[in-house]
């Protein structure tokens, strides 16, 4: 009898266990597609980024011109740039939906995979931030100046830390060079951590919408879920191509069409849309250090979610009260995103402060207490 090479070859065996013969719960829904979509986004970003890096010049006198050169003179350079820019937005859409699914269905109880996922989110945000600086437009320069300046809020070492990151006394050539180096390096670190993320996930197997043990009802990943994932790929690639080809500047800031000028400050300094919720939390606290700590905590609060799980049930599917507060959290995050893009004036300041308090309260108090109450209602002692 002929042996199947994918089941015996040392390398193919790993791929087989991860992508072909992987036992998957039969009832996982479309919300489980986003893991593979994140993989697609990462591969697309690395490939387009590699081609862009071949023509980009990390020097303040040439960076802006080199981006124009890519858009005008390089074969399909405009397409690579548009896909790379929109790819970042799609990456964040997918990761936020992936996290929301994890929160709703209790996937965070697989603590190792969840914690590595939070680290991946942080690395993705760092990569996107340093990447946004590279075109060296007005918003690139001032965004870099404002965000790196936040480190000066830390007592004693703050100013030293800022100058160390800048490589001088202001955002200058040294800053751009190192940001390019970080932007090139970090995606490969994300790729390595993604493999570890998948490794930990496959130790226990995927969660499912019911939040119960599904060992008695598993089907192979291929062909059932591989085709389902391909359908997701098709939708994302279609949307990405439509936006990149028909609306290339929809999400870009108009200020970034102006070369960086340290003497002229833009009217509203704001990051890309995917950072606005954290930026709104930062702005809602009048104290500089307090704002920076709140900004960091708005992301790292996800690490506390497994510790704050008080329910006897894993998934939210049978917990109507927790569902209400979960959707309140989603709405709250959308409100914070909107507030982050508004000028610093009333009533936006007050709305931002209320939404920031609600954001942390829902995570730390409201959802854990509601879950505990539901245990009592259902007599789950």
Curated annotation (Swiss-Prot):
A ubiquinone binds at residue 202. It is a multi-pass membrane protein. GO terms for biological process: mitochondrial electron transport, ubiquinol to cytochrome c. GO terms for cellular component: mitochondrial inner membrane; respiratory chain complex III. Coiled coil: none annotated. Heme b b562 binds at residues 84, 183. Keywords: Electron transport, Heme, Iron, Membrane, Metal-binding, Mitochondrion, Mitochondrion inner membrane, Respiratory chain, Transmembrane, Transmembrane helix, Transport, Ubiquinone. The keyword Membrane applies. Its cofactor is heme b. Heme b b566 binds at residues 98, 197. The chain crosses the membrane at residues 34-54, 78-99, 114-134, 179-199, 227-247, 289-309, 321-341, 348-368. Gene3D superfamilies: Cytochrome Bc1 Complex, Chain C (1.20.810.10). It is found in: Mitochondrion inner membrane. Binds 2 heme b groups non-covalently. GO terms for molecular function: metal ion binding; ubiquinol-cytochrome-c reductase activity. It comes from the Eukaryota. The cytochrome bc1 complex contains 3 respiratory subunits (MT-CYB, CYC1 and UQCRFS1), 2 core proteins (UQCRC1 and UQCRC2) and probably 6 low-molecular weight proteins. Heme 1 (or BL or b562) is low-potential and absorbs at about 562 nm, and heme 2 (or BH or b566) is high-potential and absorbs at about 566 nm. Belongs to the cytochrome b family. Component of the ubiquinol-cytochrome c reductase complex (complex III or cytochrome b-c1 complex) that is part of the mitochondrial respiratory chain. The b-c1 complex mediates electron transfer from ubiquinol to cytochrome c. Contributes to the generation of a proton gradient across the mitochondrial membrane that is then used for ATP synthesis. This is Cytochrome b. It comes from Scyliorhinus canicula. The lineage of its organism: Eukaryota, Metazoa, Chordata, Craniata, Vertebrata.
């Amino acid at each position: 009898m002929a042996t199947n090479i994918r089941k015996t070859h040392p390398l193919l065996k790993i791929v087989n266990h991860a992508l072909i013969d992987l036992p998957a719960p039969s009832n996982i829904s479309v919300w489980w597609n986003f893991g593979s979509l994140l993989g697609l986004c990462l591969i697309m970003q690395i490939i387009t980024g590699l081609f862009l890096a071949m023509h980009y010049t990390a020097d303040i006198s040439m960076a802006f011109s080199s981006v124009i050169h890519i858009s005008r003179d390089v074969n399909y350079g405009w397409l690579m740039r548009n896909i790379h820019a929109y790819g970042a937005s799609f990456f964040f859409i997918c990761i936020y939906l992936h996290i929301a699914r994890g929160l709703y269905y209790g996937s965070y109880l697989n603590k190792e995979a969840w914690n590595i996922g939070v680290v991946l989110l942080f690395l993705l945000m760092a990569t996107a931030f340093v990447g946004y600086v590279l075109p060296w437009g007005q918003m690139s320069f001032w965004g870099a100046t404002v965000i790196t300046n936040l480190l000066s809020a830390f007592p004693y070492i703050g100013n030293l830390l800022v100058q160390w990151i800048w490589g001088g006394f202001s955002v200058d050539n040294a800053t751009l060079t190192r940001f390019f180096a970080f932007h090139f390096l970090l995606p490969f670190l994300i790729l390595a951590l993604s493999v570890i993320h998948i490794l930990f996930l496959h130790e226990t197997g995927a969660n499912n919408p019911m939040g119960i043990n599904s060992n008695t009802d598993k089907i192979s990943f291929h062909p059932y879920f591989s085709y389902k994932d391909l359908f997701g790929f098709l939708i994302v690639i279609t949307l990405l191509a439509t936006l990149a080809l028909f609306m290339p500047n929809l999400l870009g800031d108009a200020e970034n069409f102006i070369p960086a000028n340290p003497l002229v400050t833009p009217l509203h300094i704001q990051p890309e849309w995917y950072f606005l919720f954290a930026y709104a939390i930062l702005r809602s606290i009048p104290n500089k250090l307090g704002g920076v700590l709140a900004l960091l905590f708005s992301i790292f609060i996800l690490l506390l979610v497994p510790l704050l799980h008080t329910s006897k049930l894993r998934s939210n599917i049978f917990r109507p009260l927790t569902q209400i507060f979960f959707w309140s959290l989603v709405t709250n995050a959308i409100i914070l995103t909107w507030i982050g893009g508004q000028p610093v004036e009333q009533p936006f300041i007050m709305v931002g402060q209320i939404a920031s308090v609600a954001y942390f309260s829902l995570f730390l108090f409201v959802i854990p207490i509601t879950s505990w109450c539901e245990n009592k209602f259902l007599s789950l002692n």
